[in-house]
Amino acid sequence: MDISIIGSGYVGLVTGACFADVGHHVICVDNDADKIKQLKAGEIPIYEPGLEEIIHRNVSSRRLRFTGNIEEAVESSQIIFIAVPTPPLPDGDVDLSFVEKVAREIAGVLSDYRVIVDKSTVPVKTGEKVAESIKRYNRHGAEFDVVSNPEFLREGCAVTDLMHPDRIVIGAQSEHAIDLMKKVYEPFMAPILVTDISSAELIKHCANSFLALKISYINAVSAICEASGADVERVADGIGMDHRIGRDFLNAGIGYGGSCFPKDIAAFIAISDQLGVPFHLLREVQRINEEQKTRFLKTIRETLWVLREKRIAVWGLTFKPDTDDVRSSVAIEVVEQLLREGAHVVAYDPKGMHKARAIKAIADAEFASTAIEAISDAEALVIATDWNEFANIDLAVLREKMRTPIVFDGRNLLNPETMRQFGFHYYSIGRASVRPQ
């Protein structure tokens, strides 16, 4: 099928590349001329495992191309996906101006029937607004259908998630649009759930909020474990073995971040408030998430006493491993607070350095080129992102290079007993701290 994706960020680029890889002909559109120039030159502006290879393969086979021209995309495609940003507003709502702008641009060039698909994460009832905008600004009286098709991609696993989805959600009113969407997803051989548009829009917010709830739940439990001497990892294993609960997203740490969870939860709270049904549970999820960062920083403060002029290494800047995305990263927040208190921060991340350097709030940090360089002569190490590279570090080298062997593990990446044996003072989340033998 002929498909266009308007918006070539994380969601749009991965979606377009994977659609092309299963045989569709795809045009990815973006209004960022530099990004389109990069993509045409074979340079991939984001890091996502497996994505670069897929893009190069499908550009070579002429199933995937890039343009800044929406008119070209609309005229060439049966189905048009909207995958533009929906950034958060100060009140927790989301800015839908990019979605509205694209809807108007589509309307301006739409002359024949097309299916317009909301792929961006949007508040319930957005599909109705998109349809109204296209109808209002289309001068040709062209027929069209609007569909909600939320994405469930995890950065770092996005290619796998798209190629092997748990489910496909299609929210639509038209049987013709549903049939076309089923053809798009036929190669993926995944269960398809067909709903009304509002339900599809709500499913995305409900899913992300529930996952964030699991994270905040285990983080709240971690505080109880620290107070009682229990081990949060064993507690999580015990409850996660129940198939009704599952072990995923029960990893205690310094809280969730990224471009989705914080924004989507705030948006869901705003949506529920606007509907007159306040979602108090989600406010508590937010509170626990903030409290977890505060507790972690308090441990650092109480252990090191005065942070001013202390050399502190920070491993990890991205909001999670296997991505270069530093948006709303808890790791960045930790670095920012350490700098604010006068620490000399030396930071390292396997993939996020370029984007982290551009963040003004942490401009005073020193950026190392390797993990070992970061910890050389450090008075403490903070692990803020759970990259495999950090889990597999040579602890003897780590101990030798550090000035004082103090580690604050915000992701429970290392084994407490092993850290004790190697002579570290080790502090993690929801587990007893250890001291050298």
List the predicted regions and their residue ranges.
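Structural/interface elements that position substrates and couple domains in central-metabolism enzymes
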Residues: 1-437
